[in-house]
A protein has these predicted regions:
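A single, central transmembrane helix in multi-pass transporters
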Residues: 21, 25, 29-33, 163-170, ...
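Helix-loop junctions on the cytosolic side of multi-pass membrane transporters
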Residues: 127, 169, 174-197, 380-391
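Loop-to-transmembrane helix entry/capping segments in MFS-fold secondary transporters
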Residues: 45-46, 131-141, 326-336
Length: 406
């Protein structure tokens, strides 16, 4: 599948995207409104930030224990239920005079409910698309996410200039209801991909199974570590250039859009499997110039070029799917989303600590150097695994999957 026309003719792909766009728009508009509401109520930038990103942290905890449900529950029902739960929770958040403790209790519940969302959506996308259409379809999904974030934050900011935060939260709740409706009417009722009941023990057993394969381990590390270290650099835009942080983030979004479009649409599969390492190096190398503390214009160019390298995620996700049984696709993608969120959080914390001890520019450079080092190390390990798998005779662990070659 090499054309957008063929992609959008795929049954259910368009309603899948529309439901996701409505959900993402609700998240951005609602998150900005809630952060503003908490800041006005408490005067605390910390509580405001946690109110916006707290559900993601709770989602990380929930996915650690509940991820087996991504393949053991019917996807349409789960996605509709998640959207309805967010609509109800966001409506509660809009209630006047709601105590801050109650706000964070609702956010915790929302995060736990959403812990299945990434795995269920990823597995459903894998079901909807053919194998040769996954990268193109995922690239459009990623581009839509970036565009929706930019439009959602811009729209949310404009709405907050005209309306009070509770009114914006009610608008977000309506968008969640729209996402649930589109999911219910536009998607087919599929059975679970895997038999059995979701449980904590099943989650841990499947996590262990996915991690037991060395090619999959290398693929997961390639998805998480270089990306997380560079996101640490990204987190320092505000302290590096307070007056131009928005410009740098916009340039990063532009680079991601270009990279996803190019890799998903223009790069043939025979080439795609060989460019994971070059793309991961591209993701980090331009940040090395920050050691010279470049002006905003040059910084914007470096950020734009570097962000094209985020398209490595498409290549590595395609590899992950080739290494994973279809009945574990949702769990495997959910584990990827969980690990990536964790490593990005670690990267941001590490970068902030380095910036406190040195300077934002030095910290960004060090994080980029760490990303380059991790990419080179993983490439060497991948080559060793490729040679080991190609050697005659039995291999330790009895792996039958292809090696994680770069």
């Amino acid at each position: 599948m090499r054309s957008y026309r063929t992609l959008f003719r795929t049954p259910e792909y368009t309603p899948f995207l529309l439901s996701f766009a409505a959900f993402a728009a609700a998240q951005t508009i609602g998150g900005l409104a809630l952060g503003t509401l908490v800041l006005r109520a408490t005067g605390s930038p910390l509580l405001s930030a946690v109110s916006m990103f707290g559900p993601q942290l709770a989602q990380l905890a929930g996915a650690t224990f509940l991820l087996s449900g991504a393949d053991r529950l019917p996807p349409r029902a789960i996605l509709s239920g998640i959207a309805l739960a967010f609509a109800a929770g966001t409506t509660v958040l809009a209630l006047p005079g709601l105590p801050v403790r109650a706000v964070f209790a609702v956010l915790l519940l929302q995060g736990l409910v959403a812990s299945l969302g990434g795995g269920v959506r990823g597995g459903l996308l894998n079901d909807i698309l053919t194998k040769d259409g996954y990268v193109l379809g995922r690239s459009v999904y990623n581009m839509l996410w970036g565009l929706t974030q930019m439009a959602g934050f811009a729209t949310g900011g404009a709405l907050l200039a005209l309306l009070p935060p509770p009114a914006c939260l009610l608008l977000a709740a309506a968008l969640y209801l729209l996402a649930a409706l589109v999911t219910r009417l536009g998607l087919t009722a599929r059975p679970p991909r895997s038999a059995g009941r979701p449980s904590i023990s099943a989650t841990w057993r499947t996590n262990a199974l996915l991690w037991s394969s060395r090619p999959r381990r290398l693929t997961y590390l390639g998805l998480w570590v270089p990306n997380g270290l560079v996101v640490g650099s990204d987190s320092l835009y505000v302290s590096y250039a307070p007056g131009a942080a928005g410009t740098l983030y916009a340039c990063g979004a532009l680079g991601m859009f270009v990279g996803d479009m190019a890799v998903g649409r223009l790069v043939p599969p025979s080439v795609r499997r060989r460019i994971a390492t070059p793309l991961r190096l591209l993701l980090a190398v331009p940040y090395l110039c920050f050691v010279l503390r470049p002006a905003v214009a040059l910084s914007a160019v470096a950020v734009t070029v570097a962000s094209v390298g985020f398209a490595a995620g498409l290549v590595l996700q395609e590899r992950l799917m080739s290494l994973t049984p279809d009945d574990l696709a949702g769990h495997a993608l959910g584990l990827h989303a969980t690990g990536m969120a964790a490593l990005q959080g670690v990267g941001a914390a590490l970068a902030g600590t380095l910036a406190q001890l040195t300077s934002p520019a030095t910290a960004m450079t060090l994080m980029a150097a760490g990303s380059v080092t991790s990419t080179v190390s993983l490439a060497v390990l991948g080559r060793q695994e490729e040679r080991r798998s190609a050697a005659p005779g039995p291999h330790p662990g009895g792996l039958s999957e292809p090696a994680a070659a770069d």
